[in-house]
Amino acid sequence: MKDESSFFTIDHIIELENGQSIRVWETPPKSDTHKKNSTIVIAAGFARRMDHFAGLAEYLSSNGFRVIRYDSLHHVGLSSGQIDEFSMSIGKHSLLIVVGWLRAKGIQNLGIIAASLSARIAYEVINDIDASFLITAVGVVNLQDTLEKALKYDYLRLPIDELPDDLDFEGHNLGSKVFVTDCLKNEWDTLGSTFKAVQGLNIPFIAFTANGDSWVNQSDVEKMIDNIDTTQCKLYSLIGSSHDLGENLVVLRNFYESVTRAAVALDKGSLDLDIEIVEPGFEDLTSTTVKERRLRNKIENELLELA
């Protein structure tokens, strides 16, 4: 990839054979930092666009990382498709396309950061993509349990023909039949399926839970880590946070700092977060957020003109 460190965000498009496309944003490492070994791929949580992680990208790039973000197919954001057709397998497919695209560009050392629902997707593929390390934040490990808590009802137990057309999840209409059918057919739903996916994990892995998370049981995350036969895993808690990592500025800053420390540590082969990092200024974070919002609006307007 071309080094365009002076430009705040580089917009890429992965064109697929079926006419769909995945939008990717690249944040190069800051020119005045020591470049890290790994390129970071951020997989945002459900109903979160890649620009929601502008602040985290700014933190990571200020500490020497090239950062890659993307919007999944059939999701909110700038990639093709509608969210009522989203499924876990489509999320998996999108992540694998982005990883393959980076490999084709000669980028070998990839660190994966995944939040919430995307963490369950990362757990599913992590043993197959030859990543350098994995970081998850409020990562879903028992999808059926999390969905029941989020939706106030266990829809995965209903027969498919009794499901409502859409489920209101995080303020978006999730196509229930598409999503639930995929969950059951491809075994995304249980804690045991997550155990199976991460069994044999042999790369460094740090998981962050939130002590106020009502959607993910920390005990389930602990069981998952205990199920991994390695000493390269560590669990940390984001004190004072709920499942919503952006609920206030204090929680958000703690999330940015903690995940950045984890990335810097893992890039050096350590699991210890007691390290110094560069913290970007509030003005830099605000400027990046505003610029990315303008870029997103510009792209959305262009897509509307083409429709």
UniProtKB/Swiss-Prot annotation:
Identify the InterPro entries for this entry: AB_hydrolase_fold, LuxD
Q: Which UniProt keywords apply?
A: Acyltransferase, Luminescence, Transferase
Gene Ontology BP terms: bioluminescence; fatty acid metabolic process
SUPFAM superfamilies in UniProt: alpha/beta-Hydrolases
The catalytic activity of this protein is classed by the Enzyme Commission as 2.3.1.-
Pathway(s) served: Lipid metabolism; fatty acid reduction for biolumincescence
Q: Does the keyword DNA repair apply?
A: no
Q: Give the Gene3D superfamilies listed for this entry.
A: alpha/beta hydrolase
Active-site positions on this chain: S116, D213, H243
Q: Please, which domain of life does this record's source organism belong to?
A: Bacteria
Question: What's an example of a GO molecular-function annotation for this chain?
Answer: acyltransferase activity, transferring groups other than amino-acyl groups
Q: Which NCBIfam families match?
A: PRK13604.1 (NF010127)
Homology family: Belongs to the LuxD family.
- What function is annotated for this protein? Acyl transferase is part of the fatty acid reductase system required for aldehyde biosynthesis; it produces fatty acids for the luminescent reaction.
Question: Do you know which HAMAP family this protein is assigned to?
Answer: LuxD
Q: What is this protein called?
A: Acyl transferase
